[in-house]
A protein has these predicted regions:
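P-loop NTP-binding core
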Residues: 1-241
């Protein structure tokens, strides 16, 4: 089971949209996938068409990462209706904010790792949609991960946030989790004709070299349309998808 965190230390860069796109790609490839909705906004759970009735959620798991609790907080995505494949969601909740303090204990940081160990044989891939901060929830996600991808957009403040994120990943790798590595930087919401965007992409490449992943993701209405309809991007109709 490979665990990938999708992170950004700045809100509004399309982190959750990227998570949903990666989930759609994994589903299209037939990978048994679990998406962990760790962002207190819980938008992944909405975007993947989850029925939360009678189920526990990520806050319950962080309080008690036992197998019984973990399995009760996992629901199949509505994407699977009428389509083959396995893609589940560990349901998000605004209550997760209660576990996002600035100074988590070592015990708290390892709770998600403990929870995922209970379902390790069930999945090929785990995607974690992280909170847009560097508090306890993000550190908990990174401690449970093999790789982290950092989502940014080609703007001044977002470039600075990507730099902070990569420095923090290295800090966690050295101090807590030697297996953790950055997968790279996904540059999202690119307007190809924008000189400012071209400048910022060059700046990112100058700063981070091969960590800047290709291709960069242009702004596309199909992403918002698929997300708004709670459908996987890879089955969304039209050339724009």
């Amino acid at each position: 089971m490979h665990v990938l965190s999708v992170s950004s230390l700045k809100g509004g860069v399309g982190k959750t949209t990227v998570t949903l796109g990666l989930a759609s790609a994994a589903f299209a490839k037939g990978l048994r996938t679990l998406v962990v909705d760790l962002d207190p906004q819980a938008d992944v759970s909405t975007g993947m068409d989850i029925d939360v009735t009678g189920r526990l959620n990520i806050a319950d798991v962080l309080a008690s990462p036992k197998e019984k609790v973990v399995r009760a907080a996992i629901a199949p995505s509505g994407w699977t209706r009428g389509r083959p494949g396995k893609i589940d969601v560990l349901i998000g909740s605004p209550s997760a904010i209660n576990f996002d303090g600035p100074h988590p204990s070592i015990r708290e940081i390892w709770k998600l790792e403990e929870a995922l160990a209970n379902v390790e044989s069930d999945y090929d891939l785990v995607l974690i949609d992280c909170a847009p901060s560097l508090n306890a929830l993000t550190r908990t996600a990174w401690a449970a991960s093999d790789r982290v991808t950092v989502v940014t957009e080609p703007g001044l403040f977002s470039v600075a946030a990507a730099d902070r994120a990569l420095r923090a990943i290295e800090e966690i790798r050295r101090g807590l989790s030697p297996r953790l590595q950055p997968l790279g930087i996904i540059v999202n919401r690119v307007r190809i004709q924008s000189l400012e965007h071209q400048f910022r992409i060059k700046e990112l490449r100058d700063m981070f070299g091969p960590l800047v992943l290709s291709p960069q993701l242009p702004e596309r209405t199909s992403l918002q349309q698929a997300q708004g309809a709670a459908k996987p991007l890879h089955v969304w109709p039209g050339e724009s998808a």
